[in-house]
């Protein structure tokens, strides 16, 4: 059997403040750190070993994986950070309070930006100092690849080629893997892995800091999947 752990980072400061976070590098809150540590204990109970751990470039995902390793006592020899696993870029909405934005633009418009599959928010100004093209961490990435705004579809088109080229081949070699990422990059991965339709994927809610354990056979057919913390589990939507 082959094991894949998918985990959304623990609660971040901007999650707590109900802001659109996107590519902003928000830190974990104390609650978020504790969520990550608890996730590590849950993973430890599985009694598995992992050779690869993946995270995005963003600190909330990196620190979540670090805290998982701390409490699980896992020794993962290969830790890989990939910007392709970053959160969806929320464009000009980044940093705005979600409730206040709904009051300004209307609930319907904000829900289209947040939950439609293929409608991105207005783009972030390239002159914004927080635009990723102006940050040192992304200086070695082709500027043409750096988004100003993304829909969930755009996030899927960024994340899944990386998964197919770099993660799926490892699974096919029977490597156990942990991926620490974000709500929307994990939606993209779940859409691919579970073959969820465009219409249904927008309804998938993934809680912070709760590991999803997926078990495959050697042909990557899914044998089982579940949240390790059943008290905070969200229902999977596995529909075509």
Task: Show where each model-derived region lies.
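Active-site glycine-centered loops adjacent to acidic/histidine catalytic or metal-binding residues
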Residues: 9, 84, 182
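Short beta-strand scaffold positions
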Residues: 55-56, 179-181
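Short, hydrophobic/glycine-enriched beta-strand segments
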Residues: 3-9, 179
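Acidic, low-complexity terminal tails and accessory targeting/binding regions
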Residues: 2-3, 39, 85-100, 148, ...
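Internal catalytic-core helix/loop-beta-alpha segment
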Residues: 112-116, 121-123, 135, 141-161
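Loop-to-helix element that buttresses phosphate recognition and phosphoryl-transfer chemistry
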Residues: 11-67, 71, 146-163, 203
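Short active-site segment of divalent metal-dependent hydrolases/proteases
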Residues: 12, 185-186
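Phosphate-coordination/substrate-recognition cap region in phosphate-metabolizing enzymes
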Residues: 39-132, 138, 191-215, 222
């Amino acid at each position: 059997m082959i094991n894949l752990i998918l985990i959304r980072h623990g609660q971040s400061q901007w999650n707590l403040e109900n802001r659109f976070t996107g590519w902003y590098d928000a830190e974990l809150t104390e609650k978020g750190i504790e969520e990550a540590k608890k996730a590590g204990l849950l993973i430890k109970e599985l009694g598995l070993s992992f050779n690869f751990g993946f995270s995005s470039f963003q600190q909330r995902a990196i620190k979540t994986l670090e805290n998982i390793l701390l409490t699980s006592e896992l020794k993962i020899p290969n830790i890989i950070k990939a910007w392709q696993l970053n959160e969806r870029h929320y464009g000009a909405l980044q940093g705005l309070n979600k409730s206040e934005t709904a009051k300004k633009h209307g609930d319907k418009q904000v829900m289209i930006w947040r939950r439609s599959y293929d409608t991105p928010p207005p783009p972030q100004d390239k002159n914004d100092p927080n635009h990723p093209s102006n940050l040192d961490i992304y200086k070695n990435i082709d500027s043409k690849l750096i988004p100003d705004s993304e829909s969930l579809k755009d996030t899927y088109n960024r994340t899944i080629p990386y998964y197919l080229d770099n993660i799926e081949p490892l699974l096919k070699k029977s490597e156990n893997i942990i991926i620490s990422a974000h709500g929307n990059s994990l939606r993209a991965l779940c859409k691919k892995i579970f073959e969820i339709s465009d219409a249904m994927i927008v309804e998938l809610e993934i809680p912070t800091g709760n590991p999803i354990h997926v078990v495959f056979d050697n042909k990557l057919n899914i044998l089982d999947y579940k949240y390790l913390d059943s008290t905070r589990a969200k229902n999977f939507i596995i529909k075509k």
